[in-house]
Design a protein with these regions (language model features):
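Residues at the starts of beta-strands that form the adenosine-phosphate
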Residues: 6, 29-32, 212
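C-terminal helical "tail/cap" subdomain of flavin- and related membrane-associated enzymes
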Residues: 1-4, 8, 252, 292-293, ...
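Conserved N-terminal helical subregion
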Residues: 2-7, 24, 50-180, 224-237, ...
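Conserved Rossmann-like nucleotide-cofactor binding loop
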Residues: 15, 39, 157
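Conserved FAD/dinucleotide-binding core of flavoprotein oxidoreductases
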Residues: 86-111, 182-261
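Conserved Walker B
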Residues: 37, 156, 285
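Conserved mid-domain beta->alpha element of the FAD-binding
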Residues: 9-24, 151-152, 177, 204, ...
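Glycine-rich FAD pyrophosphate-binding loop
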Residues: 24-44
């Protein structure tokens, strides 16, 4: 009997778990996941899964989740930050097909689903990985194990490419606050609300059908401090203090939050998919600004594409680069552009922006052309 290909996955987040799920039933692979933290429920955090990622997740039974636990997004309402005057609305139903709708949910639900779908077919070790050398994973408990292939999926603060890569993490001139509010009556659980202001914007969306919502408030910031953790505790009072020119709806949302967290926003200017037999995926490979809600979606795409390659016995990083680089670069570029567009403060430029947004959203052909490149994606190896 031919020996199985051994795969070590560093990181038990979205990217690593999706990849493992696609290969869990294959008799050709033996997989272990290394995740230093226990899988316990963290504070609720909103996550958006656009159509391109939903299509992939359905292949591992996401469409069997109780639909009450997430919310289908039908449109994006775009408002002025200061007065809630409506600029336009984007009809997401242009891209929604049955069971392939754009959805928003609590990230904990997604992780729990991915873990349950593994059905204990893949071993998960709660050990901290210290280093990767010569295809060997070295853990803090002195455990060393060699693999044929290693998948690095340990997120934005990844340390396992090389020193130059570790130091390539850059901070964007923006600071984000986020929180979740429970039992909020917004009148709908099917919309994303986006508010555009001077050097700031605010995003609000449901994470289930029970009245729970996630918000993110992003401000231009020149702070150069880098936190060793992704987020730190804040408060609704602190956020209200820097949101004095927000409309009443935004202030009401912030006031309703019991827990608020803030974090600087990072990115990696270059993409690194790995070398030799060490593949890098998701935020570890191409951390991008979160201004197109594509971080999780691109991690899911990476995982699916790589798993499809492995199923066809293509264990080649050059091939992976050839099918992923241009798409990731395109979406990352759009995300950077959105930050500039959302935060315009010049009155004339804002008027031009609003006119263009109205045109894009009003005409289906233009909407489908502009957003279809992202949401209609279907990978063919």
């Amino acid at each position: 009997m031919k020996n199985k290909i051994t795969i070590g996955i560093v990181g038990g987040g979205v990217a690593g778990l999706v990849f493992a799920n696609f290969l869990k039933d294959s008799s050709r692979f033996k997989i272990k996941i290394f995740e230093k933290k226990e899988f316990t429920n963290k504070p609720a955090t909103g996550i958006q899964i656009s159509n391109n990622a939903r299509r992939i997740l359905n292949k591992i039974n996401f469409n069997q989740i109780d639909t009450g636990q997430f919310s289908e997004v039908h449109k994006v309402n775009i408002f002025q930050y200061e007065n809630k005057n409506k600029i336009a609305e984007l009809n997401i139903n242009y891209f929604n097909n049955d069971k392939e709708e754009y959805v928003s949910l609590d990230r904990n639900l997604l992780i729990t689903f991915l873990l349950s779908e593994l059905k204990k077919k893949i071993e998960v070790y709660h050990e901290e990985v210290i280093s990767i050398q010569n295809n060997t994973i070295h853990c803090s408990n002195k455990l060393d194990e060699k693999f044929d292939v290693i998948i690095v999926a340990d997120g934005i603060f990844s340390r396992f490419a090389n020193k130059a890569w570790e130091n390539s993490l850059k901070k964007i001139n923006a600071l984000a606050y986020r929180g979740v509010i429970r039992g909020y009556d917004s009148g709908t659980t099917k919309n994303v609300d986006l508010f555009l202001g001077n050097n700031r914007h605010f995003v609000f969306y449901p994470i289930n059908k029970s009245g729970d919502f996630s918000f993110t408030s992003i401000f231009a910031s020149n702070s150069n401090s880098l936190s060793s953790d992704y987020s730190s505790a804040s408060s609704s009072e602190e956020l209200l203090g820097i949101s004095s020119n927000a409309n009443d709806e935004i202030k009401k949302i912030i006031s309703s939050a019991s827990n608020v967290y803030k974090w600087p926003i990072y990115h990696r200017p270059t993409i690194n998919f790995g070398q030799d037999q060490v593949f890098i995926i998701g935020d570890a490979s191409h951390a991008m600004p979160p201004f197109h809600a594509q971080g999780a979606a691109q991690a899911i795409e990476d995982s699916f594409c790589l798993a499809q390659m492995f199923e066809k016995n293509i264990l080649n990083i050059s091939h992976f680069k050839s099918i992923r680089t241009s798409r990731v670069e395109m979406i990352s570029s759009k995300s950077y552009r959105n930050l500039f567009i959302y935060h315009l403060s010049n009155s004339f430029l804002k008027k031009v922006r609003n006119i263009l947004i109205k045109i894009i959203c009003k005409y289906p052909l233009i909407s489908k052309f502009y957003f279809g490149k992202i949401y209609n994606y279907k990978f063919k190896n």
